[in-house]
Amino acid sequence: DTLSYHKKWMNEFLDLLIAANLNVSWTCCAAVNTVDDKDLLKKMRKSGCWNIFFGYETGVEELAENIQTNKKNRDFEKMKKIGKWTKEAGIEVRAGFLVGLPGETPALAKKTIQTAIELDPDYAQFTVCCPYPGTKLANEIHEGKWGKFITHDLKDYNMWKVTWLPFGYKNSEELKNMERYAFRKFYLRPSYVLRRILAIRSFEDIKRYIKGGRALVKGFL
């Protein structure tokens, strides 16, 4: 997320990359407030960047407050503007969103999903919030503030398994079903499916979409 934080360093790095003419393709993660520059995005594309992952996390202000995300990175209009600029520069936009945040209910989760649809990134990733041991959030859960842990097995601590249950959910299956619902709601929109079909430019694109479609069917339908 910090690659583009220092603008001077980033511009110098990109200039060197372009001058070296290495013809490399690369991706990165970035915070919204660090790429608020059209020229920087264009230079990133010229140097070979084809994809940026933004961690938007949620579309609900109170949930963002609960996990103390940077206010500069959760302004909806700014998210929308930077996403538009990134696409205009010829760079794909991938966005990450969380379900099962502290203070969340199914109704609030659906607001986050709606935010994802309105922001309309090229690809969206929805994962279950996983409070790792030793973090502030994990400590608060241990104190009974937001919900309860349902496992302490470190093998389960990843973004795909439910390790804790917020008070707003009845059980882990309800939370996991919300994650599945998010993927279906985002990816099965007719407008989205049509746009991806029209974006096909090569056989590699077809193979990539088939692979992604299989993963969607297997994991979330």
Language-model segments: residues:
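A structural motif corresponding to the C-terminal lobe/cap of the Radical SAM core domain
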Residues: 4-7, 12-204
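Short linear elements at protein peripheries
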Residues: 208-221
